[in-house]
Structures are given as structure tokens and as C-alpha cells.
Amino acid sequence: MFDSTLNPLWQRYILAVQEEVKPALGCTEPISLALAAAVAAAELEGPVERVEAWVSPNLMKNGLGVTVPGTGMVGLPIAAALGALGGNANAGLEVLKDATAQAIADAKALLAAGKVSVKIQEPCNEILFSRAKVWHGEKWACVTIVGGHTNIVHIETHNGVVFTQQACVAEGEQESPLTVLSRTTLAEILKFVNEVPFAAIRFILDSAKLNCALSQEGLSGKWGLHIGATLEKQCERGLLAKDLSSSIVIRTSAASDARMGGATLPAMSNSGSGNQGITATMPVVVVAEHFGADDERLARALMLSHLSAIYIHNQLPRLSALCAATTAAMGAAAGMAWLVDGRYETISMAISSMIGDVSGMICDGASNSCAMKVSTSASAAWKAVLMALDDTAVTGNEGIVAHDVEQSIANLCALASHSMQQTDRQIIEIMASKAR
């Protein structure tokens, strides 16, 4: 817990990070369904014999092409089956961390027997929705998750309703940390990062520990598109310079390679996404190492990166047509700029240049190619920092970038929240037609 003597705003900042920056094993959309299945299985009277599931179009989009850790298989059906047969119902985003070889074999057998189905929920007004219903004979249990990857809103069995989340807020209840964060500014976040006691934010160093381990695993070249390992190999061949810029890209993309390729190591996520957590963490770690930063300086830079990423992503739908590795990299740009320079002006210029650079990148579902987008975003972040250090940036006279960084962020998020909704539908239609 944090120091209760901190001012209330800073306490809410820390709570926001603690809520949004969590370990996650496997891509979080399939994992959300696996969690629903695991919780349902825990309520079922008897072993699971059949699994039915329904998900929102956006969750389907992010579950079609991603490998489920430990299985070597892609997609939502294996996630649902393994969650039901080997999931830890109390582990949240690490629901599959205890899955045994036998559970994986049983899940694959259940799939092969045609006992697992995953469909799009229709109609569905929720961006993030997953429902799993498990059966043992005529007995069943059903769990629904809505709004957040672990936000269970309803549990029901053949005997009746077990749990329903109350929608109303009790009188006098404090606003959520994210609600408070939505009314803050980057300048206030920077003041917090500069002045908060180190002991209150030391926990953020865990993001470096987890994501560095994932990056090291990715450099083995066994996972996903092995972008990080390939680029490292090209450095050895003399086709790519061995410098800070390449190290940022290599180590960041390697973590995403391992993440999307199904490595059985957790990522420290941000805003419900492992890739966002990786993108907000690894560039900052690499730059901190380059400058010999101590733990306190690294923690402050990571806190700025993660909190800025949460602040920006909080203005977006939880899932959208905008690749959120780009917004996480805006947080990384802030953290790297702080390490090198520390000035608000440098940080705001770097974020503005990011918005002018990679804001059009679409999300076409979770897959190994996410590591490509992560590498692009990390590279753009460092480029934006280098420009800002030379007092240059995309200005308010260009495109959607405004003269004020807060308005630039608002403009980007308005595009993703409104105009890009049709883009999202088109992406889902294209992906669904390929899956037939």
C-alpha cells in the first residue's frame, strides 16, 4: 500500500497504476475468455464436459490470431477450453499460469471432440464482452465479463443467480482512480513523478523485471515473427547499427515476439494489454541503462511512462481500431524524454510528434504481427524524443496536432472513439470473411 500521508490526488494516481499495470500471462482478450471459463468451471458441480462461449466482435478480432501460452495453438476455442479445464479462477489475468500438461492435453481433446464453441454475441453493444457457459450433463454454470478483462458482472448456474454486479454507485463512494485521472493533465502527472517519495512508487520496477525477462526470452528467436532476434542478427552482420536506437527497437520487439508467440512468461500489462505494458516499459529501461540510471530514476521514468499511457488510453474505447501500442509508446516517449532532459516542454513536444507520426496505425487483431507495430511505435517514440531535444516537433499548424499537447491527445482520441468505429467494423468484417 502507499503512504496515506500523500495528497489525495497522488494516491489516486498510484491506485490507477496499480489497477491498470498488472502481470498477465498470454494475450489479454483470449485470457479474458479463459478467466470466464475458469470461474464458471469453479461453480460447476462436476467436471467440464462441454464449453459454449460468446464474445464481442472486438474481442473476437483480438482472439483469432494469437497463440495461447503453452498450447502451441491459436484462437479463442483453446483459450476457453484450457480455462475451463486447467485455469486458476483466482488468478485474474494469470488464469493459465498453473495449467498442467495434462490440462492442455484434455483441452485439446475437448476441442477435437467438437465440445467447444465460440460465437460472436449478437446483438452486442459492449466493446469488451466475454461469456462462458460450461456443462456437466444437464448441470451448467455461466460467467459474464463486461467492460474490463477481469470485470465479472454475472455468475449463474442451473440452480440460479450466484452473483450480479451492482451498477449503481453507493452514496458517498469515492470516484474511481481513472475518473480522477481523466480530469488531470500531463503537467500535473509530471509534478507527481518529480516529487512523489520513491518508496511510494518503487513497485513499478516490477514492470521492468517482468518485461525484461520476456524480452530476453524473445531474443532466443523461438517466438512469433522473432523480429527482435532477427534485427539483432542483422546488427551482427553489419546491416544495422549497434546503437541505442536499435537496442530500443530490438529489446522491445523481442518482448512482444515472446508475448504473442505463446511464451509461458507473464508480461506486465498496461490498460489491459501486455503489448501496451511492454511498449511503455522496455524503451524506458533501455534508455535508463544507457545513462546508468539508478533504481529511483528508473522508477520515476517508468511511472511517468505508464501513467501517461494510462492517461491517454483512458480517453479511448478499451478496444478500438487504433493500435494502442502507439499510445503506450507516447508514454514511453515521455519517460525517455524525462530521463534525458526532464523538461515538460520536451515531453510535450515528443508526444505531439508521436501523434503526428503514428496516429493512423490500425489494430487488425492480436497476432504475431503486433510485434511489428510495437517495434514501429518504439522507434517513433525515440525519434520524437531526439527531435524534441533539438527543440523541434510537429506543430499545431499540421494535421490533427494542436498547439497544446492536451488538445492533440483529445483530437487523436476523438478520431478513435468516433470516426474510426466504422474502420473497426470494416476490419472485423474482413477478418471474419478470412476465417470462413
UniProtKB/Swiss-Prot annotation:
GO terms for biological process: L-cysteine catabolic process to pyruvate. InterPro entries: Ser_deHydtase-like_asu (IPR005130), UPF0597 (IPR021144). One of its GO terms (molecular function) is L-cysteine desulfhydrase activity. Coiled coil: none annotated. It holds the Pfam family SDH_alpha. It comes from the Bacteria. HAMAP family: UPF0597 (MF_01845). Belongs to the UPF0597 family. This is UPF0597 protein YhaM. It comes from Escherichia coli (strain 55989 / EAEC). The gene is yhaM.
